[in-house]
Amino acid sequence: MATPRALNKAIFTPTLYQSIRDLWFSGLPWGAKSPTEEATQRWFTGSKEAKAAFDKLCHHHLNPAITSISPSNFPIKGLTDAEIAAPFVAEIEVAEDGGDAEAKTKIALSFMILLDQIPRNLYRTKETLPLVYGHYDPIAVSLARHIISMPVGSSSTRWDLFPGIRHSLPYRQWFYIPLMHSEKLADHKAFINILEELKEETREDKEIAGFVENIENFENIHVKIVERFGRYPHRNNCLGREPTSEELEWLEGGGEKFGVSG
């Protein structure tokens, strides 16, 4: 049976995990109910110049970590979800900086950002996007599936449900974005179920409810595409997939590309 390679202990350290969070959440208090305008621009709405500057920061601080789990250094072909996620789960479980639930949650969150988001900051071209879709996304979604399948009980806390961020969507959302990026409908259904549970929990808090609604609307855009085509047509070109006539017509008619060119 194939097994994943271990993470490079010289790279994957508490210092790395802290630097990921410092970079991604700069200026945003732990547990915040709403993102700051600065954070929103950093993640979603920044200008072309601002995105380029942030990409440069990501490359400077995190490229060694991303490269250390590249296809050649961390091959995943033939591995199950559990096997792919195993090295990351093991690293979270040891939690060198204390080992409590909050420490584990923070490391898990750092991994979700590193695996799902940072490759998108480093690899934006047609030539490099296949690395995102074909390698880093499968790793990210494998870890996300593991996390949401963890048992919830009095003796343990599922990392995405840690009380400090349970009602903090600016933090908690990153555990689930890999499900949104997935082309498997089951992942989208899992995300929608989580959002429904969160809506029920927070319906009395208008600040949180509004943010949940925004995420839900964005997920609905994604899931409708996967329901219709079984995949994201805007990825066809860079992945060398032959588009269907329906996909071509849809894309030419303004179908969603989520900011991806080529």
Predicted regions and their residues:
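Intrinsically disordered, low-complexity activation-like regions
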Residues: 1-262
